[in-house]
Amino acid sequence: MRRMIEDELIANGIYPNLIGFEYVCIIVEYIIGSDRVIKIMKLYELVADIKNTTTEAVERSIRTIVSKYNRGSDKKLCNSEFIYTLAWKIKGRYMKDE
């Protein structure tokens, strides 16, 4: 699953050397594994606990990723829209493969 998320991010021009790359992977992986919608701030707190950082740092790093994605896209997304769109796209592909 993690590899599919990384491949999708790289295909969108977001590379692993960016700080928020791993944060996005963790959040998307958690969303895909969950059977309910979770508030994005709760997910930021989860990642902050896992990575021993602050929620603000996680949000700022993800905002960097989203702004990089928005530069190459016609549609401008906010953090939560980007994360949930990515998660559902990958989940749809994952379910199709099974």
Each language-model region and where it sits:
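Basic, alpha-helical nucleic-acid-binding regions used in initiation and control of genome expression
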Residues: 1-12, 18-22, 33-98
